[in-house]
């Protein structure tokens, strides 16, 4: 069986800030946007979490929960540089590394001969190296399969690790709450519970067709996970499937025209990102996202052989109808990408949106 490690840095952005600015240590701290500019929390330390502050929470609400919260803007270039340090540490142990974000990654150490091939000891060594060289702590999950390693990395936080051996894998999976499986959000979990399914053991007692009937393709994935199966390989180089840009607004917008003005302001940045990261691919769809003042959101998309600003405007107009009187707090646009054929690559490689 494979030996998979999932490394997850502990409250990463906040930890970097506490490392670089010791005066923040021991105090509730969050990294995010300003509360007077409709900001959102990116991450927070454990002192802030004790007050109920969480990632993706509105900064203004976080300050209500924790009036003494220290709120600092993010320093993305610093976080990226430290993340690169961490990935260099990973590369000492394996070349099979799948970064999921700046602060987490999967590693396949099946062929690593260090520490007599013990994945447990390799995970300990990686975490030790990270702390010695960056001053930051990491947690780890070790398992023969990817999703269990990810779940396990959260069980002994912060600065710990949890091992699910091949012998204990099925026992661990059977007892696992379905809400712990990556991809199962609150709404999906509620639907599963309504079907009488709360744990993987429950899913093991029903036919796959029940899940696919209610959840489509994801139902088949869920069935596999609940039976302790996850054959996904480590993906070292992941092609981006979309490029997007969005902005949280200082004040809610209540007219379509105001939203269209914001959309127009996002186009130059989207073009810049497309030019930087979409080489060898072409646009095949455009997407507009709106988030409302109750934090619910909607997206609408359309196939686009000849993408244009006018199509974005049409999509936004359709999405705006769904506001039903609610204010708009965020506007986002994105372009879905697919690989070009050789013939297409010999022709124009222009990805900029036409006006």
Swiss-Prot record:
Q: Where does Mg(2+) bind?
A: 8, 103
Q: What name appears for this protein in its UniProt entry? A: DNA polymerase IV
Cite the active-site annotation: 104
NCBIfam families to which the protein is assigned, alphabetical: PRK02406.1 (NF002677)
> What class does this enzyme belong to in the EC scheme?
transferase
**Gene name tied to this protein:** dinB
The main location class comes to cytoplasm
Q: Which domain of life is it from?
A: Bacteria
- Tell me, which GO biological process terms does this entry list? DNA-templated DNA replication; error-prone translesion synthesis; SOS response
Cofactors needed by this protein, per the record, are: Mg(2+)
Q: Report the locations given in the UniProt record.
A: Cytoplasm
The record's cofactor note says: Binds 2 magnesium ions per subunit.
Q: Identify the taxonomic lineage of the organism of origin.
A: Bacteria, Pseudomonadati, Pseudomonadota, Gammaproteobacteria, Alteromonadales
* One Pfam family linked to the record: IMS
This protein's assembly is summarised as: Monomer.
């Amino acid at each position: 069986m494979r030996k998979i490690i999932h490394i997850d840095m502990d409250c990463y952005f906040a930890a970097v800030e506490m490392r670089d600015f010791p005066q923040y240590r021991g105090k509730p701290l969050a990294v995010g946007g300003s509360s007077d500019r409709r900001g959102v929390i990116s991450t927070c330390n454990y002192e802030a979490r004790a007050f109920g502050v969480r990632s993706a929470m509105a900064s203004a609400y976080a300050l209500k929960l924790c009036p003494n919260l220290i709120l600092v803007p993010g320093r993305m270039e610093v976080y990226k540089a430290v993340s690169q340090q961490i990935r260099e540490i990973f590369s000492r142990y394996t070349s099979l590394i799948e970064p999921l974000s700046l602060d987490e990654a999967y590693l396949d150490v099946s062929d690593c001969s260090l520490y007599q091939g013990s994945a447990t000891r390799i995970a300990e060594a990686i975490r030790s190296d990270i702390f010695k060289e960056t001053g930051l702590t990491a947690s780890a999950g070790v398992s023969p399969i990817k999703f269990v390693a990810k779940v396990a990395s959260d069980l002994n936080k912060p600065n710990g690790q949890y091992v699910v051996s091949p012998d204990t894998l099925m026992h661990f999976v059977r007892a696992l709450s379905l809400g712990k499986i990556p991809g199962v959000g609150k709404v999906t979990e509620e639907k599963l519970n309504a079907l009488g399914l709360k744990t993987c053991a429950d899913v093991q007692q029903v036919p796959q067709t029940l899940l696919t009937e209610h959840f489509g393709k994801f139902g088949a994935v869920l069935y596999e996970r609940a039976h302790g199966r996850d054959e996904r390989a480590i993906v070292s180089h992941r092609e981006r499937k979309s490029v997007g840009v969005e902005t949280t607004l200082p004040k809610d917008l209540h007219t379509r025209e105001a939203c269209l003005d914001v959309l127009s302001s996002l186009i130059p940045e989207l073009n810049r990102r497309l030019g930087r990261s979409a080489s060898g691919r072409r646009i095949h769809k455009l997407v507009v996202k709106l988030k409302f003042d109750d934090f619910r959101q909607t997206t609408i998309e359309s196939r686009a052989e000849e993408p244009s600003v006018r199509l974005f405007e049409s999509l936004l107009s359709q999405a705006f109808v769904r506001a039903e009187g609610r204010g708009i707090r965020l506007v986002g646009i994105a372009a879905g990408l697919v690989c070009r054929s050789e013939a297409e690559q010999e022709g124009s490689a222009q990805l900029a949106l036409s006006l």
